[in-house]
Design a protein with these regions (language model features):
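UBL (ubiquitin/ubiquitin-like) substrate-recognition surfaces
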Residues: 1-438
């Protein structure tokens, strides 16, 4: 999520970005590669005070070294474009602490304005950000007072664009899903023409388009009027490694996504069953004790079957002639892998047939409703004006030099802490849900 990353904060603010879980649909990389950037005018390299060009240069420099270096050109461009980030610390030493989400939003807004497509096959006004990172809400605004409804005031329908989803944190929110649901309803005070005065309205939002990359902002910093400062909400809010966004979608979009999402889950289960069966055959082949994958029931009958299977496998392993044996031919790993590959290809074909033409026409939208967590930005500290930001990015599998495809991921993450980069286990990500240091 790291932009590809999910930002959750160090007991503080968290924000995050999920990448569409589409490994069962896309045969290639689901990310945007160099050719995609060139299509939006990010081809060359050269020192520049322009924020967009400086970011391009920064990405290129980072790709050419594993050593740490200060991104001064980019920082100078950011401070020039947005003077708030050039604010000095109150003690006069260095720059003031800034909010990561504010910096992210300003950078994305700038990129959205500057990165216009120069590809003849795309709309001239289309932005890279709009294409890959923007979603759409269908909204309904309705007055809370019955008197307005009785007077004939109708709900107002509209459409909004979003570049991130907000996870609102209240005393009732314990999980990301609950925080996102809270953000889908908003109370607004506005004038009612029917009542002739201000009244409270409820604005309900439902997602009509899911982007390929989805940032999620955990709203852990809240403005306190009594102290005139931002306070950090330390409440623990857990989050999944796979986000199912279907429940937040409009009814029309749900109808398109649910068949695809359910098919993906079915394919995963089949793959898991095949892998379990392969391991079980290996254990039997080597004469190891083995339990049936799914016992038919409890009681003497099942126990007898278990004992018989165990006894038979032991006799086969020892070559005993006490019982009549049939020759058993075991499949090789190559045969099993070939069958598995054929099964996956067939399942992918069936899956593609389930994807609606409307979704297929939009090559940069999410077609499954599922997102995989790829990165997390965290904040350590109790206040917004101090602390320390670090980030976690999920490791990609190594590229096979022969096929060019990436190998299976090992589930580990890179932890970026200033110029120090270290590898951490998946369990470390579970500690970033707040309620403590993070």
């Amino acid at each position: 999520m790291s932009w590809l990353s999910t930002s959750l904060g160090k007991t503080s603010e968290r924000a995050g970005c999920h990448r569409e879980r589409a490994d069962a649909i896309n045969s290639g990389s689901s990310g945007a590669g160099p050719s995609d950037f060139r299509a939006f005018g990010l081809g060359g390299l050269g020192a520049s005070s322009d924020l967009t060009e400086s970011l391009r240069d920064l990405f290129k420099q980072m790709s050419e070294t594993q050593e740490g270096f200060p991104p001064m050109m980019f920082l100078n461009a950011l401070r020039t474009a947005f003077p708030q980030f050039a604010q000095k610390a109150k003690d006069g030493h260095g720059y003031a602490q800034q909010d990561a989400e504010e910096a992210w939003s300003q950078i994305v807004t700038q990129l959205r304005q500057k990165l216009k497509s120069n590809d003849a096959s795309q709309e001239a006004s289309e932005s890279f950000i709009d294409k890959y990172m923007s979603g759409k809400f269908e909204t309904v605004m309705e007055c809370d007072e019955q008197a307005a409804k009785d007077g004939g005031e109708q709900p107002v329908k509209g459409e909004d664009t979003f570049l991130k989803l907000n996870c609102h944190i209240t005393a009732e929110v314990n999980h990301l899903r609950e925080g996102l649901a809270a953000g889908m309803q908003e109370k607004i005070e506005k004038n009612s023409e029917v009542l002739g005065r201000n009244s409270m309205y409820t604005k309900t939002s439902r997602i009509a388009r899911l982007p390929k990359y989805l940032p999620v902002h955990f709203m852990r910093f809240d403005w306190r009027k009594d102290t005139s400062k931002k306070a950090k909400i330390m409440r623990k809010v857990t989050f999944p490694h796979e986000l199912d966004a279907v429940e937040f979608c409009s009814e029309d979009l749900k109808k398109l996504l649910i068949p695809v999402r359910d098919k993906i889950r079915e394919i995963r289960k089949e793959e898991e069953d095949v892998e379990r069966a392969r391991k079980r055959r290996k254990r039997i082949q080597h004469g190891e004790d083995v339990e049936p994958a799914e016992p038919k029931g409890k009681g003497p009958a099942s126990e007898t079957e278990l004992a018989k299977e165990k006894k038979d496998s032991q006799k086969k392993a020892s070559g005993s002639t006490d019982v009549e044996m049939e020759d058993v031919e075991y499949k090789t790993d190559a045969q099993i892998e070939a069958e598995r590959t054929a099964s996956i290809l067939k399942a992918k074909k069936e899956l593609l047939e389930l994807v609606d033409g409307e979704l297929l026409a939009d090559d940069s939208c999410n077609k499954t409703g599922l997102y995989e967590l790829r990165g997390v930005i965290t904040h350590q500290g109790a206040t917004a004006d101090s602390g320390h930001y670090t980030s976690f990015v999920k490791k990609e599998g190594q590229k096979d030099p022969v096929t060019g495809k990436r190998k299976e991921e090992d589930g580990k993450w890179w932890w970026f802490n200033d110029d120090k980069v270290s590898e951490v286990d998946n369990d470390r990500i579970e500690t970033l849900s707040g309620g403590g240091k993070y």
